[in-house]
Amino acid sequence: MGHFTEEDKATITSLWGKVNVEDVGGETLGRLLVVYPWTQRFFDSFGNLSSASAIMGNPKVKAHGKKVLTSLGGAIKNLDDLKGTFAQLSELHCDKLHVDPENFRLLGNVLVTVLAIHFGKEFTPEVQASWQKMVAGVASALSSRYH
């Protein structure tokens, strides 16, 4: 897992303070389900996922996206212990939900894309580098329970 410099932490925390968890979370999960349709199988209970517009307008997708991003907010407060922060979620996604750990990497990359869209010029290459390191760390932590 990557080591976070003080600069990384400041960069991540600064942008995070401006993130609308509901909007960015819903858009991130929605885009994951549209761009990588095989991920939809984990969300059978979410109802209509038949088209991009159905997915992006689905209230359950938005609600779960917010939940995902809220948990990410907890990680941002504990960047030096991502594995510990995500131990229970890793266990849930591995043992109970059987989610392919590759999906965590995909979700992280989609989040970076959504942040770039939302923050435009403010999302500089340096900011992206810190966020890529963070989403890679989170994906690794969430995958830690897998054998």
UniProtKB/Swiss-Prot annotation:
Claim: Iron is one of the keywords in the record: yes
Alphabetic keyword roster: Acetylation, Heme, Iron, Metal-binding, Oxygen transport, Phosphoprotein, S-nitrosylation, Transport
Superkingdom, natural source: Eukaryota
GO molecular function, one term: heme binding
Record-linked CDD domains: Hb-beta-like
PROSITE patterns: GLOBIN
Tissue expression: Red blood cells.
Gene Ontology CC annotations of this record: blood microparticle; haptoglobin-hemoglobin complex; hemoglobin complex
InterPro entries: Globin, Globin-like_sf, Globin/Proto, Hemoglobin_b, Hemoglobin_oxygen_transport
Domain named Globin: residues: 3-147
Entry-annotated residues carrying N6-acetyllysine: 60, 83
Modified residues (Phosphothreonine): 13
Residues in the signal sequence: none
Residue(s) carrying S-nitrosocysteine: 94
Modified positions (Phosphoserine) in chain numbering: 45, 51, 53, 140, 143-144
Stored Gene3D superfamilies: Globins
PANTHER family hit by this protein: HEMOGLOBIN FAMILY MEMBER, HEMOGLOBIN SUBUNIT GAMMA-1
Family: Belongs to the globin family.
Quaternary data: Heterotetramer of two alpha chains and two gamma chains in fetal hemoglobin (Hb F).
Protein name (database record): Hemoglobin subunit gamma-2
Organism annotation: Hylobates lar (Lar gibbon)
Lineage of producing organism: Eukaryota, Metazoa, Chordata, Craniata, Vertebrata
